[in-house]
Amino acid sequence: MSLLPYALARPFLFGLDPETAHELTMASLARTQGTPLSLAWCSSRVNDPIALAGLKFANRVGLAAGLDKNARCIDGLAAMGFGFVEVGTVTPKGQPGNPKPRMFRLPEANALINRLGFNNDGLDAFLANVQQSRVRRQNTPNPLILGLNIGKNAVTPIENAVDDYLTCLDGVYPHADYVTVNISSPNTKNLRALQSDEALDALLGRIAERRESLARQHGKRVPIFVKIAPDLDEAQVDVIAATLKRHAMDGVVATNTTLSRDAVKGLRHAEEAGGLSGAPVLEASNRVIRQLRAALGAGFPIIGVGGVMSGQDAVSKIRAGADVVQIYTGLIYKGPELVNEAALAIKKNR
């Protein structure tokens, strides 16, 4: 367990603007990781290994992309007990994202709305940070699995999006345990159009070709996952599942944030533009996971994410068909203690 209960820090952090609180937390984490001060949030890692997509995960709870967009805090995040950590989304060039304010808390619903828009420092800075991480340089029996999440720049026309994804894939490939192709953020104009039949087929076809070339060049085949939205009907999920299999993708991350506001109507900030995350997304995400599992069959890796606020929520994703889960908004509301709570619940209830 953490030596400093998150309950002591949360009132201070929740007294700040959400993005200011996030920046302060990440800056503190970056400065203290690997030092004695990190004992304030360190935790022993639950041992519950699983082999997935050719990788060995130490346990079944990971960090979702979006918290550490620039890969500055890999070591500090690893110390919280995660079995895997996904950082990004990174784009070829740095970009500021959408105008502020762009992040809003809905505490009555244990939820957040964000319209950040892939704000990040760009691929070169991202890769420099990845390479400086201590956990990536340590030779341990159960190393941290690191996922690198890639996207497109806002100024890149959607018809040229594949060029941005290939640029990022070229850069991250030597450094990633797996790569996630993010085509589901609602905060980059037209990005979700890449989930449609023909667009997804074309994109994944190019990515698959480039991966084969990179595998020959680097002497290793890095698994590629695709992150999709919760706002899909059954027919759309079936098309995506078939396209993933056709292009030999290694897994799917389900799901990103939702545009729906049905679960938060009437709450302050509920009508802000952006993606809704947290508790209200749990069932929508689980529905997509169930549909994916039915369409993909047993054995196709699914990372379940969306609305995990407790150990029981994590178990619900495994029962829906996910192999492992990720958390992000739950970490903000519940603190690092949620990592082990979720990992232990999955271990006990599988």
Curated annotation (Swiss-Prot):
Pathway: Pyrimidine metabolism; UMP biosynthesis via de novo pathway; orotate from (S)-dihydroorotate (quinone route): step 1/1. Signal peptide: none annotated. It catalyses: (S)-dihydroorotate + a quinone = orotate + a quinol. Gene3D superfamilies: Aldolase class I. The keyword Membrane applies. One of its GO terms (biological process) is 'de novo' UMP biosynthetic process. Substrate binds at K69, N114, R115, L116, G117, F118, N182, N187, N256, T257. Its cofactor is FMN. Binds 1 FMN per subunit. Keywords: Cell membrane, Flavoprotein, FMN, Membrane, Oxidoreductase, Pyrimidine biosynthesis. Catalyzes the conversion of dihydroorotate to orotate with quinone as electron acceptor. Monomer. This is Dihydroorotate dehydrogenase (quinone). It comes from Polaromonas sp. (strain JS666 / ATCC BAA-500). The lineage of its organism: Bacteria, Pseudomonadati, Pseudomonadota, Betaproteobacteria, Burkholderiales.
